[in-house]
Design a protein with these regions (language model features):
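Residues immediately within or flanking Cys/His clusters that coordinate Zn2+
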Residues: 1, 18, 31, 38, ...
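Short cysteine-rich clusters marking metal-coordination/redox-active sites
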Residues: 3-6, 21-24, 34, 41-44
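Short functional micro-motifs and their immediate structural scaffolds
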Residues: 8-12, 29, 39, 49
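Flexible, glycine/charged-enriched surface loops at secondary-structure junctions
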Residues: 11-13, 17, 31, 106-108, ...
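Short, hydrophobic/aliphatic alpha-helical segments
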Residues: 19-26, 65-76, 108-126
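Polybasic, low-complexity association/targeting segments
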Residues: 59-91, 177
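Conserved phosphate/anionic-ligand binding catalytic regions in large, soluble enzymes, centered on
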Residues: 85, 125-144
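A structural-propensity feature for long, helix-poor, extended segments
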Residues: 145-146, 150-196
Length: 227
């Protein structure tokens, strides 16, 4: 990711530095700095990274949503700072879905809305509220692409809840402790199947084994179907 001021690369430092954010000018303590020593506050970093998410999604030609998610996971800045499936899962689904359409969506607008809603999902919602962020992100994705709102009549309104509910049920049956990647795999697979059934759009999917085991010290190991 490039500094908007000087175009040099932004990196993550091991230590925090005090200074003024080069974007908004407020005093901040940050571990994000560019090659010319410009600092970035948390709020501006998140805005820049959301733009990075959109850039990766725009450039992706994949019709497999998990492949898009891996592209996001593997970006240095996103991985170390902004790994929130609440936002990334829906963005990856929208990208793969759009790549399957002959008449494309306004992907930037769709991603903006998915990320806006995804940011409202509280952290640790899986254990504190029975709502996995990845599962809810799938519901957000489906709601946005079908333009469903609280007063939408008929089955369309219910489809969003049915999808989210099926993701949660399938994930819950595996048991804890939580794993964000497992939540993404279960929920995205359910969503791929549901979109084909309800909307007639066939995204790509292949069975996978997890190669992010090292990210989760509480990995279930052989108790996880993706181990």
């Amino acid at each position: 990711m490039k500094c908007p001021k000087c175009e040099s690369s932004i990196r993550k430092e091991d230590q925090m530095t005090n200074g003024k954010c080069i974007v908004c000018g407020k005093d901040c303590e940050s571990d994000r700095i560019c090659g010319n020593l410009h600092l970035f506050c948390d709020d501006c970093t998140e805005r820049l990274i959301r733009e990075r998410v959109k850039e990766i999604c725009r450039d992706s030609a994949s019709k497999d949503p998990y492949s898009v998610l891996e592209e996001l996971y593997e970006d240095d800045i996103i991985r170390t700072r902004f790994l929130k499936n609440h936002i990334l899962v829906g963005s990856a689904l929208a990208t793969a879905y759009n790549n399957c359409l002959s008449e494309k969506m306004d992907l930037d607008s769709v991603l903006d809305e998915i990320m806006r809603r995804g940011a409202l999902i509280p952290p640790k919602a899986c254990g504190h509220a029975g709502n996995c962020g990845s599962s809810v992100a799938c519901g957000i994705f489906y709601s946005v692409i079908t333009d469903t709102h609280p007063l939408t009549p008929g089955e369309q309104w219910g489809d969003v809840s049915v999808l989210t509910g099926s993701c949660l049920v399938d994930l819950g049956r595996i048991g804890g402790p939580r794993c964000c990647n497992r939540g993404a795999l279960v929920s995205m697979k359910d969503t791929v199947d549901y979109v084909e059934e309800r909307l007639g759009v066939k995204m790509e999917w292949k069975d996978r084994k997890c190669h992010y085991k090292g990210w989760n010290k509480n990995c279930k190991g052989e108790g996880c179907p993706f181990y």
